[in-house]
């Protein structure tokens, strides 16, 4: 049974040049991560500390939420609570309508992607403009982000150049020079920032004991979105809290190094209250996070800081692209988040993992996304989504390994499979795995036989 991820990945792989570029680009980011980590002898200690801080915070969430909201409200910030995506979208719309807002400029926010806020507001007559360059590109392409940090990296410079020409952003036909395109985008976005009547930002971290909203960007779009319009709306998942500034310092040292290999993002902005003469709203969103918190097996998913490191290192993501995943957040962490939100559909992504666990080793908060996926695979039969063919094969393997004589007979007959033409193994229904893999060559003799015959270098079998 081929999943939707596998089918989408097959479509992505029809362009080998793009796949190679995608793979190499993200692997370079992984190498940059390693180089940045190597500069800090205390790197693993930071990861341990980050994991402990996050675990402590999410298991004491009511206390920290009360502390956080009290600090915000003491400075005149209006705090809202949204149980799910529909409530969140409705709250944002009500705030915008109360201020007669027609144009909203946004800083980057994966929470708004999760809640499908943009299409909802646009349907209600609000002009929503992404202020992050990568997000703006995919918005104009009518696509969703393919990565949570670098949302448009699946596109080539030629594709971006053509898009900017079509949209009237660039005016030199065929000019796809990155510096020129960036200059054109800057001019276009500056106009949008100046016209917007409200700005919306996400939130990388919320500091409980000070009430800080911390937003990390490389383009300064969060600062533009909050310093020009008088109305500032913050979209924040309830898991984004850290207890204090000391805790924040740990994550600040990890976030950019894990996400892009930088020591820090170019801009780290702290918002505590509205600008003079303005108004600030913070919308705290649950949208299934309480359910994750109740799950002993998957609670650690809430430790994720959305750095994207698991995607950068994942061999499946790098070679299949972010749009091959059915959930809005792709890659290893997206598999688990999708399963928590809608397992009967998002199970399509559970097979998108080689279980190499490279993602476990790079995750700054030790979420262990690969290990989480392994657990999810064990649960597929409970929700009626296990592949029946795989289940039958597993039963067959159990029988084979529990009967030594049968196993030895199968081992002796295995070389006969070498006579089967490789094309005959490419049956979509019976062997979808074979389509993307080279047929292995079976050895004429097993290692055990060679060892007994004394044909293994450095080892001799001693007969009793």
Where in the sequence are the language-model features?
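The feature marks the mature, well-folded catalytic cores of soluble enzymes
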Residues: 1-297
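Helix N-cap / loop-to-helix initiation motif
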Residues: 84, 310, 368-369
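Conserved, hydrophobic alpha-helical core segments of structured domains
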Residues: 302-309
């Amino acid at each position: 049974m081929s999943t939707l991820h596998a089918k989408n990945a097959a479509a992505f792989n029809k362009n080998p040049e793009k796949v190679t570029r995608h793979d190499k680009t993200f692997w370079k980011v992984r190498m940059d991560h390693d180089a940045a980590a190597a500069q800090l002898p205390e790197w693993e200690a930071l990861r341990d500390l980050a994991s402990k801080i996050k675990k402590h915070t999410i298991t004491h969430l009511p206390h920290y939420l009360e502390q956080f909201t009290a600090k915000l409200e003491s400075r005149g910030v209006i705090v809202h609570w949204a149980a799910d995506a529909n409530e969140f979208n409705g709250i944002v719309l009500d705030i915008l309508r109360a201020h007669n807002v027609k144009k909203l400029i946004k800083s980057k926010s994966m929470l708004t992607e999760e809640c499908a806020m943009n299409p909802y507001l646009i349907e209600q007559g609000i002009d929503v403009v992404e202020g992050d360059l990568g997000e703006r590109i995919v918005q104009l392409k009518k696509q969703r982000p393919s990565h949570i940090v670098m949302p448009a990296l699946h596109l080539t410079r030629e594709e971006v150049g053509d898009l900017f020409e079509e949209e009237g952003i660039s005016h030199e036909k065929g000019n796809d020079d990155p510096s020129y395109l960036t200059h054109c985008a800057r001019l276009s976005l500056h106009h949008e920032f100046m016209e917007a009547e409200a700005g919306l930002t996400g939130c990388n971290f919320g500091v409980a004991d000070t009430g800080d909203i911390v937003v990390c960007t490389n383009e300064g779009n969060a600062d533009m979105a909050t310093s020009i319009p008088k109305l500032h709306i913050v979209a924040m998942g309830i898991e984004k809290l850290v207890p204090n500034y000391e805790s924040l310092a740990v994550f600040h040292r990890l976030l950019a190094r894990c996400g892009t290999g930088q020591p820090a993002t170019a801009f780290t902005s702290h918002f505590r209250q509205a600008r003079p003469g303005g108004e600030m709203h913070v919308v705290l969103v649950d949208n299934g996070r309480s359910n994750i918190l109740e799950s002993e097996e998957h609670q650690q998913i809430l430790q994720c800081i959305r750095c994207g490191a698991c995607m950068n290192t994942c061999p499946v993501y790098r070679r299949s692209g972010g749009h091959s995943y059915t959930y809005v957040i792709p890659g290893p962490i997206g598999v688990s988040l999708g399963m928590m939100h809608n397992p009967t559909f998002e199970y399509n992504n559970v097979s998108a993992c080689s279980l190499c666990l490279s993602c476990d080793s790079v995750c700054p908060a030790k979420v262990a996304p690969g290990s989480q996926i392994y657990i999810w695979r064990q649960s597929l039969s409970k929700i009626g989504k296990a592949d029946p063919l795989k289940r039958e094969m597993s039963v067959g393997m159990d029988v084979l390994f529990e009967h030594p004589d049968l196993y030895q007979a199968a081992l002796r007959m295995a070389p006969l499979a070498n006579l089967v033409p490789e094309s005959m193994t490419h049956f979509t229904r019976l062997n979808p795995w074979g389509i993307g893999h080279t047929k292995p060559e079976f050895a004429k003799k097993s290692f055990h036989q060679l060892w007994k015959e004394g044909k293994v270098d450095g080892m001799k079998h001693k007969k009793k």
